[in-house]
Amino acid sequence: SGPGFMGVR
């Protein structure tokens, strides 16, 4: 749910 790994966070 954010700018993390592929947007998975």
Swiss-Prot record:
What's a GO cellular component annotated to this UniProt protein?
extracellular region
Principal location class: secreted
* Subcellular compartments: Secreted
Q: Tell me which residues bear Arginine amide.
A: 9
Query: Is Secreted among this UniProt entry's keywords?
Result: yes
GO terms under biological process? neuropeptide signaling pathway
Query: Which of UniProt's keywords are assigned here?
Result: Amidation, Neuropeptide, Secreted
Quote the function comment for this protein: Myoactive peptide. Increases the amplitude and frequency of spontaneous contractions and tonus of hindgut muscle.
The protein's name: Tachykinin-related peptide 1
